[in-house]
Amino acid sequence: LLVLLSALPLLWPDVPPLLDLPGHMGRYRVQLDGSTSPALQHYYSFEWRLIGNLGIDLLVMPLAAVFGLELAVKLIVITIPALTVAGLLWVAREVHGRIPPTALFAVPFAYNFPFLFGFVNYALSMALALLAFGLWLRLARLGHTRLRAMLMLPLSVLLWVCHAFGWGTLGVLAFSAELVRQFDRGRGLFMAGLVAAWHCLALAPPIALMLLWRSSGSRGVTADYLNFDAKLDWLRMALRDRWEYFDQTCLALTGLVIFWAMVSRRIHFSRNLAASVLFLSLVFMALPRIVFGSAYADMRLAPYLVAVALIAIRFPEGIRPGFMKGVAAVALAFVLVRTAAATVSMVLYDRSFDRNLAALDHVPPGARLVSFVGRNCREPWAMSRLLHLPGMAIVRRHAFSNDQWTMAGAQLLDVRYRDAWPFMRDPSEVVTPRPCRREVWLTANEAMAHFPRDAFDYVWLIDPPPFDPGFASDLQPIWRSGTSTLYRVPRPKLDPKLRRTPSAG
């Protein structure tokens, strides 16, 4: 029931309102229709490569053929929290022999900040890593270590292809669990570590794939090590959604539960999962902010670290049933409150998405569209999640959008439309009310003044900051909702050969 309940917040929105997801959906559209759409061929190129970040990119191929792209993405994204909850509860059951009531406090971490940020391949890989870890523990408990090795060889490759971080996390979890298992069988710590490493060789094949990927010309950098102030912020934001005090109170409650387990004589931690928490903590501290050009690498691990600590709490056999029921009631209430809040938050974000996406009804197929999305130098707790909404212009209109990510070796998509320079790619869609330190974002005035008029047919402003209206005096407004506006650029005419109605879905 908890697995099914975790899908509830995402049932209503037609486009899951996750920050980066519309941008990814734009790439999926190019991937699916780029070979048959003259407009998409003109604006973008797409080249398949084996990289450790292909989870949903591969899943949409068969599902979009059946359901259409938008519904296919929604169905996949809905499964991510459900799989995460299933993985957490399975691991708890394998370690404790039953699901302790405190494990329920980990359930809301399925809707963690990295997931809401739109790191969907990462979140999917972490959900699958938890499920694979549950299988690892079960087969060890049953004594089927040879079967486990045979299964983990292909599973590790599939997990790496989904996202390399999920594979790495599974390796950390598996090694720590096997270390404790070997230690409990009477081996010294050093020998237990060697034997655990031997068992984990079944997870090693993706190392060759990683080396091949990194030697193929990827320019992704790794940087910003040991930024402990940021790491504390990432922990504080583990449940970040919409209401700061509510989210912080909920996180504080889970912190109190963990602290209670540390000092209580009634309950304690499983040594198996305590070792996992220790190793994950070391990885979290050592991870830089940027890995292979992928930002927020350490931030992504923070909520899973807390969730594993929660499922590590163990109740001894002789504890009173009434006490267990009381803890279970509090934990279940916590799950229901967080689920209700996440559902309301998703509905509100969905309204914001729908209000702005109405502009696309006025954009012809194949249009050359430049978009500017407002944000502040310092984002409020409740992020707007609109920064990559322009990607939906690719999905629904086969239009050009300047929000796509490009990085040699790390992205499958590249931008061909050089006339748009420097408004070709992310983050040229971001505009701010004033210059921001250490950022390359333009102010709204700079963007409106300098985008090349002859390269675009339409300008889409999405919740922009105030700007000098004189910079839009040569543009024709054709749609408006609040401060969001769609302008037509009068002079350029759309090349007739690019007018092709996109397929449904």
What positions do the PLM features span?
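Transmembrane catalytic cores of multi-pass membrane glycosyltransferases
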Residues: 13-24, 35-37, 44, 52-53, ...
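Transmembrane-helix motifs of polytopic, lipid-linked glycan transferases
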Residues: 75-95
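Transmembrane-helix signature of polytopic, membrane-embedded enzymes
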Residues: 88-110
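Short acidic/glycine- and proline-prone juxtamembrane loop motifs at membrane-interface regions
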Residues: 117-124
